[in-house]
A protein has these predicted regions:
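Bacterial N-terminal signal peptides
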Residues: 10-19
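Short, structured active-site-proximal loop/turn typified by the sulfatase FGly-forming signature C/S-X-P-X-R
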Residues: 52-110, 215-217
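Short, solvent-exposed turn/loop segments enriched in Gly/Ser/Thr/Pro and often Arg
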Residues: 81-101, 219-229, 316, 552-559
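Catalytic-site neighborhoods of secreted/periplasmic enzymes
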Residues: 143-188, 193-259, 549
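Active-site neighborhoods of enzymes that stabilize oxyanions during catalysis
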Residues: 172-185, 198-203, 413-537, 541
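Active-site His/acidic residue clusters
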Residues: 222-223, 227-238, 299-351, 388-390
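Metal-dependent active-site segment of extracytoplasmic phospho-/sulfohydrolases and closely related
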Residues: 350-393, 464, 538
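Acidic/histidine-rich catalytic neighborhood
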Residues: 371, 375-433
Length: 569
């Protein structure tokens, strides 16, 4: 192998990791329009459109029927509310986030799930933390195809909040937390590891804004979600992602939005942030603290920088509140099909709302509220809202039925493997040479057992995702089959979940989408809208060309017309 090329590649990687970890202060003066100099993007993961409606208007049975998200409601008084907004399909966090920051669907981005499959790659050098086994890779040989792991499994140490990043503070998770030996490898590039930011096929809002001279920052839940930087990895100036699937630890100096100290672990009976209604509030508070620093013109570590032109984060608390059953505490979720929140979900919505109030106050303290466009949405929803519809079926799943017909790395027959791409959806890639119609026939014959709702394959899948396969001209990432089950059926088989996401159902995809700015008049849009429209709207609001986004150009994704109409008055 060419040594010079390896040295050059290593140097480029070092620059990428340095940029994603420490950032390089930039002058934002070249980015912005008359009314918008900054954009704040917030994803309240799991927040349905109806959740926002209920909390802003009140619903009998919660908070004495009074509204319980005053800060969100206040933003709506100078905002445009899109009540028929749809997230990505599949509605997993990874494609959901990519929709927001690229303007594209999985057809363009190549991101179907955080754990998916690529027919042109080979497996990692060492087994990932989530069980994707090490596999051979021969440089420039024909690939065998592999499951691709872009979640906590590629952390150096996913039990640690900092992801195991060497030399980093215990709470400082960044792209430096990624273990290159756990990454899928590309035989066509000499078996080089494929970093998350190079796994995505399109550029992102961060790359476009950074290239135009804007300072960029993002906060999320996995180091792997540094993929939002886009190809090359240089689109982000500051990235912060303490590992959400790490062990729960005390957070000295951090208080929840309601003022409760996180200096000691609030709920020591669980080991995961996502498993506790209380601990997840501390996890979110840690990241809100970082966002407040960025608004003040600092990096997430507190060192000096500038206020980003584009910044934001995701919140985890609402999704935990709507999907978790915590032993000894109670069930989250909803009390009925009208989306009346449980006491646990109610407290998570209230917690996030207070945090948003703190963030808005920080913008005002910095003197930039009047020229900041605030977009609040969700990567995904969660299904079912109606608690009587939930069916956890981890035995009769499409992947189980197909068994040896799917790659061993994905198969439930592999007891130590990472598992199939199944939540309240089943995304299936078949082994090379397997018959898709034969596999579909097996699924159809067992429709009742698997709670089959709809099968997408052939033209019904290719229409929106392209033609997948192993042959030249076929998309190596497009699945062969997607199964959406009946409403409420989930294939994870979890005993601690009462809802899930990833599917195409209304509850999975109808998410909150509110765009707020002091110059906007309140407006409700009932027409169908897609979260992919957020990306071109952000770029245009900052005075840049939305067509600079490759997915927007490829798919013809429009801006949110109502936002632009009011901003341009």
């Amino acid at each position: 192998m060419n040594v010079k090329r390896l040295v050059t590649a290593s140097a480029a990687l070092a620059v990428t990791l340095s940029a994603l970890t420490y950032g390089v202060a930039a002058d934002t003066s070249t980015v912005g329009s008359e009314k918008v100099k900054h954009v704040l993007l917030l994803s309240i993961d799991g927040m349905h459109a109806v959740d926002f409606y209920n909390c802003a208007h009140g619903i009998a049975g919660a908070n004495d029927g009074n509204p319980y998200c005053p800060n969100l409601a206040k933003l709506a008084s100078t905002g445009i509310n899109y009540v028929a907004a749809s997230s990505s399909k599949p509605s997993d966090s990874a494609p959901g986030l990519m929709a927001l920051v690229t303007g594209g669907s999985p057809k363009s981005t190549g991101i179907y799930y955080d754990v998916a499959f690529d027919r042109t790659l080979d497996g990692p050098e060492t087994t990932t933390g989530t069980g994707l086994a090490a596999a051979p890779c021969t440089p420039f040989a024909i690939p065998t195809g592999t499951t691709t792991d872009n979640d906590q499994g590629i952390d150096i140490d996913d039990t640690k909040l900092n992801g195991g990043a060497p030399g980093h503070a215990l709470t400082d998770g960044t792209a430096a937390s990624i273990d290159p030996k756990k990454l899928s490898r590309n035989p066509a590039a000499g078996c080089a590891p494929v970093y998350p930011w190079n796994f995505i096929r399109t550029n992102t809002i961060f790359g476009v804004i950074h290239a135009a001279g804007g300072y960029t920052a993002w906060i999320d839940k996995h180091p792997s979600y540094a993929m939002v930087a886009g190809p090359g990895g240089t689109g982000l100036d500051d990235y912060y992602a303490p590992e959400v699937d790490s062990n729960v630890v005390a957070l000295p100096g951090i208080k929840t939005s309601q003022g409760v100290s996180c200096a000691t672990v609030r709920d020591a009976t669980v080991s995961s942030w996502n498993a506790s209604f209380e601990d997840i509030q501390c996890y979110d508070a840690l990241r809100v603290d970082a966002l407040l620093k960025e608004i003040a013109g600092k990096r997430h570590t507190g060192s000096q920088a500038v206020t980003p032109a584009i910044m934001g984060m995701n919140f985890q608390a609402v999704y935990t509140g709507e999907s978790v059953s915590e032993p000894g505490v109670g069930n989250g979720g909803y009390q009925n099909a009208a989306a009346l929140p449980s006491a646990e979900l109610l407290q998570e919505i209230e917690s996030v709302d207070i945090s948003i109030g703190d963030i808005v106050n920080a913008l005002k303290d910095k003197g930039i509220y009047d020229d900041t466009l605030i977009i609040i949405t969700a990567k995904h929803g969660g299904s079912p809202i109606d608690p009587t519809r939930y069916v956890a079926d981890g035995t009769n799943t499409p992947a189980t039925l197909l068994g040896t017909r799917i790659p061993y790395s994905e198969s439930p027959l592999n007891s130590t493997g990472i598992g199939a791409t199944e939540d309240d959806v089943s995304v299936l890639w078949l082994n090379k040479g397997e018959s898709v119609p034969s596999a579909v026939e097996i699924l159809e014959q067992n429709a009742t057992a698997i709670g089959l709702g709809q099968i997408y394959y052939g033209p019904t899948l290719a229409l929106n995702y392209g033609v997948g396969g192993w042959q030249p001209g076929q998309d190596p990432r497009t699945p062969d089959i997607i199964v959406t089950p009946n409403v409420g059926v989930t294939y994870s088989g979890s005993t601690t979940m009462i809802a899930d996401h990833g599917g195409f159902a209304h509850d999975d995809t109808n998410v909150m989408l509110l765009v707020s700015h002091p110059c906007l008049s309140p407006q409700t849009v009932f027409a169908e809208t897609a979260t992919t429209q957020v990306a071109p709207t952000i770029v245009k609001a900052l005075g840049l060309n939305p067509s600079a986004l490759t997915a927007v150009k490829a798919e013809g994704t429009p801006v949110l017309a109502e936002v632009w109409s009011q901003l341009s008055r």
